[in-house]
């Protein structure tokens, strides 16, 4: 009996003495778990911050779409490429408040910009005498948000539209 007790104590002593030693794979796994938990917290914080900014921008403009310029002046094809590379779109206001948000950007910069008008558009804001096919195949908005026919070769303010499905 004493032999069993001594053997048990000896094993316990060895276990306690080596208790700080951790299997390297287990140590790596624990490190990865900690890193993943940290990334999850950071992602949640980033998502929360993004939603706050998006809601504030939407509240200020009355639109779920954001219209952003890089202040460059380009033709229609260059605009299309720039917006596509930025994961955005050429502006296509579908509602009056969206057109107003777009026009606010143009007014701030004192420039005109391209937009796209769909064939089935429920909302339009053509200026008097427009559309005028003779002026060009593209459409531009002035600083008041009125739409005009334009040449696709005109160099206008680069504005891209971003919208989010939340």
Swiss-Prot record:
GO molecular function: carbohydrate binding; phospholipase A2 inhibitor activity
Keywords associated with the record: Calcium, Disulfide bond, Glycoprotein, Lectin, Phospholipase A2 inhibitor, Secreted, Signal
InterPro entries membership: C-type_lectin-like, C-type_lectin-like/link_sf, C-type_lectin_CS, CTDL_fold
Subcellular location: Secreted
Disulfide bond in keyword set: yes
Signal sequence residues: 1-19
Residue ranges occupied by any C-type lectin domain in the UniProt entry: 46-161
Tissue specificity of this protein: Expressed by the liver.
Disulfide bridges in this chain: 83-160, 138-152
Stored Gene3D superfamilies: Mannose-Binding Protein A, subunit A
CC annotations in GO: extracellular region
Pfam families (UniProt xref): Lectin_C
General function of this protein: This phospholipase A2 inhibitor binds directly phospholipase A2 in the presence or absence of calcium.
Family statement drawn from the similarity comment of this UniProt entry: Belongs to the alpha-type phospholipase A2 inhibitor family.
Quaternary context: Homotrimer; non-covalently linked.
Protein name from the UniProt record: Phospholipase A2 inhibitor
């Amino acid at each position: 009996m004493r032999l069993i007790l001594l053997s048990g104590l000896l094993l316990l002593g060895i276990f306690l003495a080596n208790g700080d030693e951790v299997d390297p794979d287990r140590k790596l796994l624990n490190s990865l778990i900690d890193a993943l938990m940290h990334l999850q917290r950071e992602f949640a914080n980033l998502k929360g911050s993004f939603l706050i900014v998006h809601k504030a921008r939407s509240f200020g403009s009355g639109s779920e779409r954001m219209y952003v310029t890089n202040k460059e002046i380009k033709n229609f094809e260059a605009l299309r490429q720039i917006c596509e590379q930025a994961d955005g779109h050429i502006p296509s206001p579908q509602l009056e408040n969206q057109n107003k948000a777009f026009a606010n950007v143009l007014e701030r910069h004192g420039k005109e910009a391209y937009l796209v008008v769909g064939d089935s558009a429920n909302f339009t804001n053509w200026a008097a005498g427009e559309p005028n096919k003779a002026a060009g195949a593209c459409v531009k908005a002035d600083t008041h948000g009125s739409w005009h026919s334009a040449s696709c070769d005109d160099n206008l303010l680069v504005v891209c539209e971003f919208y989010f499905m939340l």
